[in-house]
Amino acid sequence: MTTDAVQTMIPTLDVTERPAPRPKVEAGVKLRGAEKVARIPVKIIPTTELPKKPDWIRVRIPVSPEVDRIKSLLRKHKLHSVCEEASCPNLGECFSGGTATFMIMGDICTRRCPFCDVGHGRPKPLDVNEPESLAIAIADLKLKYVVITSVDRDDLRDGGAQHFADCIREIRKLSPNVQLETLVPDYRGRMDIALEITAAEPPDVFNHNLETVPRLYKAARPGSDYQWSLTLLQRFKQMMPHIPTKSGLMLGLGETDDEVIEVMKRMREHDIDMLTLGQYLQPSRSHLPVQRFVHPDTFAWFAEEGYKMGFKNVASGPLVRSSYHADEQAKLVKAELLGS
């Protein structure tokens, strides 16, 4: 297999450990871009400009009455969508189709992953009214499939697991037929209590992204652990064998195709049912640089290999994100699991 990829930037990571200044950050203050990544242990040298995207990765500007309507509804209920916070390239398509991925527990993350466009800082206390507000918004939108994700909340005793459970419970009160997928954080140091809470109010699909290959964790996911994330997914599957588990990777951070295949094998060893693979897009000059744009043919090859390994569904393409067409993927996988 010859990888057909467009190589773009020379790596600009300085992996030398360096002391980072630690000015006190006030609660509720969101750090983004250079301010955010200045606090990680690996120095990132800003690129002079963002790389030019190939033709296959360009998307239309998300402008339509439906996009405006959903944004207005989110503001009305003081909710956040990861579609906006993470600058998702599929925002226009998903919003225009009347769907959205909701981000709970605020819009300030306690982690500072330099690939991500969500702000970092000291979060405010949880909004106790958010589960009810989210349930009302979903009922107003008449959604049939909802993805709930969150910022990392390392400040919470359970990592936010109870808040996820509260949201699921309130949503099902008002929309009993809705299908719910949760895209959860890694619950670092809190796995036991988080899984106990999750099992009491489980979603219809349990998703947690590995994001990248283990060699790049120090640069891309400071504060996270590759094996911990795999174990989280496997332990949930052992507790709830009929609920699909799902994970995903971004490509273009400097990984090799062989490394991607190895991670896919490890996912299957940990009983992960569904896989998403998409192209990493650099949110700003201060974020991790794009090392390559992976050709659609290579994404198609990864999908073929994934099905050979036993994944029940593989979504692999330049614009694929973890919640992209999640309803269609989950329907097929759940039917197979329930029939097995």
From Swiss-Prot:
Gene Ontology CC annotation, any one: cytoplasm
Radical SAM core domain residues: 95-312
Record keywords, A-Z: 4Fe-4S, Cytoplasm, Iron, Iron-sulfur, Metal-binding, S-adenosyl-L-methionine, Transferase
Database matches in Gene3D superfamilies: Aldolase class I
Pathway: Protein modification; protein lipoylation via endogenous pathway; protein N(6)-(lipoyl)lysine from octanoyl-[acyl-carrier-protein]: step 2/2
Binding site for [4Fe-4S] cluster 2: 109, 113, 116
Reactions catalysed: [[Fe-S] cluster scaffold protein carrying a second [4Fe-4S](2+) cluster] + N(6)-octanoyl-L-lysyl-[protein] + 2 oxidized [2Fe-2S]-[ferredoxin] + 2 S-adenosyl-L-methionine + 4 H(+) = [[Fe-S] cluster scaffold protein] + N(6)-[(R)-dihydrolipoyl]-L-lysyl-[protein] + 4 Fe(3+) + 2 hydrogen sulfide + 2 5'-deoxyadenosine + 2 L-methionine + 2 reduced [2Fe-2S]-[ferredoxin]
HAMAP family xrefs: Lipoyl_synth
Protein name as annotated: Lipoyl synthase
Native species: Pseudomonas fluorescens (strain Pf0-1)
